[in-house]
Amino acid sequence: MTSILGDDSGSRLYWEFLDTGLAESAGMGSYDHLGCGGIMTYLCCSPENAQANMERLKALQQKIFDEGVTQKELDLAKRKIASRIVLASERTNTRMFSIGSQWLSGQKFKTVAQIAEIYESMTLAQVNEAIKAFPLDNSMTVVVGPKNDLQAV
């Protein structure tokens, strides 16, 4: 989901904010832990664009909740993720970290191919169900910068 919505290239945040020049950077990432986790969305822009961009982000989150993501977006995300997994597995420290993490969390060891297959097996319905189960507008907003008059959206 975060690859579709907030990846650094080709995501919805990219097209909404970076490609248009409304922000210097924007992205979304997931932080998963055993049994819990979170999603962080960040947006870096000029103070003059801050309020309008927060409103654009809110509208984008609502559109994602209402309409879900498309099969084309999911297919692209699967290819990106599989490529990242394979490329990262070429580094020894990444392979060792993966083995250690799986062992510490009590999981059976999975090969790179097995991990990639988990992502490949995700369906559009599953992704859209996750979006409904964990709405992006259920969040806290933190603002860093010179603006002290921003209104919550």
Predicted regions and their residues:
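His/Glu-based metal-binding/catalytic segments typifying zinc-dependent metallopeptidases
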Residues: 1-12, 21, 143
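Glycine-rich, charged/polar anion/phosphate-binding loops
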Residues: 25-28, 126-128
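C-terminal regions of mature proteins
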Residues: 78, 82-153
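A broad structural signal for short, well-ordered beta-strand segments within beta-sheet-rich domains
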Residues: 22-24, 136
